[in-house]
Amino acid sequence: MQHSRVLTMFAVPELDSPALEIPLYLSPAACGFPSPAQDYVEQTIDLNQLCVEHPAATFYVRASGHSMVQAGINDGDLLIVDRALKARHGAIVLACLDGEFTVKQLQERPYPALMPANPDFAPIYLQEGQELEIFGVVTFVLHKTKLG
């Protein structure tokens, strides 16, 4: 069984930070031939409003390791974690198991477990006497695209 380090940094967002409004093109971006008639901005969006539903309960953490790659979480990605959300079956969570942080998919049934999203890693089935604390639900993953 492989283990991965997942938690490398916490950073709490500033609650009074100004809005960062970015142009939003309302026409969907086709992954085929673009339409030149649809290249105008219709509104702007604030990334804080889009990504942070509960500012006082939201924080960022940097992912480390490869156990969640099939869930779109890569080594070095920035995760947005919301402590106000209830962790449910199937949610990707930041958990602390016996004092070690990990990001995994929460499985509540048929047996409680923390599931990786990479077949090279084994599920973590919760055993009697283990301490599990869910720190929050991962709501967004931010990563750069691979260039060239």
Regions found by a protein language model. Name each.
Residues 75, 97-102, 132-133:
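Short coil-to-beta-strand transition motifs
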Residues 81-82, 96, 115:
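Residue-level recognition of conserved beta-strand edge/terminus positions
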Residues 89-103, 107-112:
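Short, compositionally biased
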Residues 119-125:
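Flexible, small-/acidic-enriched active-site or ligand-binding loops
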Residues 113-119:
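Catalytic Cys-His active-site segments of thiol-dependent hydrolases/isopeptidases
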Residues 76-77, 91:
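Structural motif
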Residues 1-69, 100-101, 113, 135, ...:
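Short, positionally conserved secondary-structure boundary motifs
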